[in-house]
Amino acid sequence: MDGFISNGPAEAPATMPPPEPFERPPTPPPPPPEDSAAPPPPPDTSAPPPPPEDAIPAPPLEKKKKAGWGAKRAAATPLSVEELVRKKREADAAAAKPKFLSRAERERLALEKRAKEVDADRRLKTERTANGADSSSAQSTPVYPERPNSDKRVIPTGPRAMRNTEAPARSGPAATRNKNYDMTPPAPPKPMSFSLTDSKGDSKRQAEEDETVAQVALIKQRYMGEEKTSNFSAKKKRKRTTDRKFNFEWNAEEDTSGDYNPLYQHRHEANFYGRGRLAGFGDDVADSLAKKYARALEDRDQEAGSIRAREMLEMEKRRREESTRNQLDKHWSEKKLEHMRERDWRIFKEDFNISTKGGSVPNPMRSWEESGLPKRLLELVDRVGYKEPTPIQRAAIPIALQSRDLIGVAVTGSGKTASFLLPLLVYIAELPRIDEFEWRKNDGPYAIVLAPTRELAQQIEIEAKKFTQPLGFNVVSIVGGHSLEEQAYSLRNGAEIIIATPGRLVDCIERRILVLSQCCYIIMDEADRMIDLGFEEPVNKILDALPVTNEKPDSDEAENSAAMRSHRYRQTMMYTATMPSAVERIARKYLRRPAIVTIGSAGEAVDTVEQRVELIAGEDKRKKRLADILSSGEFRPPIIVFVNIKRNCDAIAREIKHMGFSSVTLHGSKTQDQREAALASVRNGSTDVLVATDLAGRGIDVPDVSLVVNFNMATSIESYTHRIGRTGRAGKSGVAITFLGNEDADVMYDLKQMLMKSPISRVPEELRKHEAAQSKPTRGYAKKSDESSGFRDKGAWQ
């Protein structure tokens, strides 16, 4: 080749300048060295090659003038800290500020990015092909960047000091290049010369991956907890503790005591006679031994042996019946009263859901025979038809017979009337007859029974006369709706028991028709209802009018039954379904160390009533639903329908008559004769449906009510409890259907809680998910009006 020498300096012809860089083809890469070939000698860098003789010398380079000490330099203005902070703040603000990009711009940027990636991949493949690297060693082979064409020079232009431009950029390993010559043959490449960069990148990438995995593990442990892994290893050697293990100096097989000692070879069988028995033997073995002993007695003693054997067998039979194991296995109903243990009484109370408190309280009675009532009274109980006592009767009668003050908390329809009438008759029977002397008639009754409504007072009077007429006691009711002259005439012969409403009794006391000089027994039935109707002040007046000579002491003696029976102290009993604060206030003031009996939980409905709740808004829809219920034939009369306001009673009664059913109404605007006639028509079966307000919700006993419909939900959960208590009485089952609306939000929470506690009722999904049923509402001082009875409530803290 002209002007080209492989191992020496290049010499160009003198007549021709070197070709331009763009006219020459690119220099091919050097071939890879053979394994057997020796590396080329190092280049001689002692002196630069001389320039060609015929070549035109290059123009001399202009020397830069050195600036001396006196030369003026351009003053450099330093950047202030404020300027740097301002620029950084502007850069951060610009980076943090979101930049809106249109869809076209986003597509353009994506296409540009993709084009750059494709271009980079194509360039990488081209370089690998040009360098002769295969795909298997692509990671370890370095990638050489392409040099621009303007920097590719082959022919030297002279010493570096005489060149116009800087030294061209060289590619390839530094060991294969000659610092002064461009065309020196390259040295063989070192295989690990460029692996340092890749190993550093791989190690950095591996460190980042390890850090990411560690962060993920920490986050998982933070939110999901630590994994429960066992550290137990079966292969791990464990040191056995032999500190407490006693090692004999001889082995067990060396023991020869069993060979020569006959005590170990022939064991003696113990024989126990009579009441003796081997531990662990059953009753059958004991019986066989007893019979064996009895036969031995008969054989040895011909005269009295048979008698002794018979007595011994009877004694063994008694012992077996009264054994501790047999008594524990028996149910409380199979045991005798003297065999009842504390555990049996606890089970008995749990069976009847009885809870008592208040000092030394006697155990409940299991049957009428164990009640302690006189024989004459037990005969009357059997004649009336009381077969088994109710839970409140089981618990309250023994306490009342010990002359203790009593607070009975029980649901409606649980037999509370008999629970206070029977102890009252026992108390009065021990007093002198009231008609024995004329002055006794004028001193007033022995006992007073207070009831909140006229209907309840008359109902108690009917129930009391079943017992008082055979015993010769006189019972008089004093209620509103009748003239005072008529009631004064009924008191002319005196009365042992007076059943009255608080308002009318206060009128009689203030008009001197009645005095309470010898009253020694007070019963308040439905005390919470009396407070709700605004009778707290009349009740306080009546209790303050009682004599103080026979008042109980407020000490431990009030809990001593013997001390209370020795002196005729006044006895006070209060029955209620709920315990508001006003009732507790009266109890603290007038009762002395009372025993409290609770059947179930205060304010709960009976378990025999199935409660159904339907969310129906609007009068028309409710009337249509009521017609469907009555026409279904599922429920037999009598049926009670409750409304909230008395003017709706007549409207609902007319609708029911249009449906083909007979109906009567009961509310506060009715006269006493109309009320009695309405209740009588329902009780004797001549009327199918009774439409009433809350007046009939407390204490009215209509037998065999199969259905109660709350056309309007009660304003309080207590009223609702007594409404549905009209059915499911005396152990019978019943159904209560309630129409609920958004206006009843104040009682939804309590209603849902009551339905959840009932084992036979279900909470509808609409009520369960209703907003008002999620938390108990906070109520303030509300003044409410009871339109059904005509009394205005004084208000109470709810």
Swiss-Prot record:
Domain Helicase ATP-binding: 397-597
SMART domains linked: DEXDc, HELICc
Enzyme Commission number(s) from the entry: 3.6.4.13
GO biological process: mRNA processing; RNA splicing
Motif Q motif, chain ranges: 366-394
Motif DEAD box, residue range(s) on this chain: 525-528
Protein name: Pre-mRNA-splicing ATP-dependent RNA helicase prp28
